[in-house]
Amino acid sequence: MKIAAGLGKNKNIIEAAADVNFEVILTESEEELSSMLLNKNVDGAVRGSLSSTKILSFLRKEYIQKIYRASLLELNNHKFLLAPVGVYEVNNLQDKLKIIELGTEFLSKLGIEPKIGIISGTRPETQGIDPKVDYFIEESVDLVEKVKNKFFIKEYLLDDAIQDNANIILAPDGISGNLIFRSLVFLGTTKSYGAVSLGMDEIFIDTSRSQTVEGYKRALELSNYLAKLKHT
């Protein structure tokens, strides 16, 4: 397998690329990384610390449908997807239903039975205090009703969802999802494997600009693993 990786200001990707047992092509150009991926010159790509916005803008030119990102995290030996993590990606109920659809497909390909946790951000008894809070509570109820006949799905508080081993955790919106990610990974002990891109055929793993050598190595290895899985 051959993986492309972005080389920006964070040079940890260089050490990570040298410590894996497959070929990694480093590039300082968002356009070149996207081109290598779309033209199938590589089997997968990892953002590194290049601009995610620029890379996604190149990739989205090839896709009519929306591309979503879901972070693959590990806490206490339990792996789960957290979404949305892009602050502008999810705007409505239909977006969340699409993330659930794509996220469950992704886990099923890995042989994992989906268990979905919907995070409304508060308890139902607080309904009626604030319109925004009411919106997220009502949306969580709608999501559970629409999906419960297909998969296990439950409304949780975040800590309860993790303790109950939910493997798709859906935050109220992209801003809160991004804050949850940064708190778990950069302030806590949660491991990040990068964010998988859902809704596209190519394998693109988004990563934080602030990632460690080990974090970038995990993202490279995930990209390589998914590429191998795709070719079997």
Describe the predicted segments one by one:
Residues M1-I162, N167, A171-T232:
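Anion-binding alpha/beta catalytic cores of soluble intermediary-metabolism enzymes, centered on
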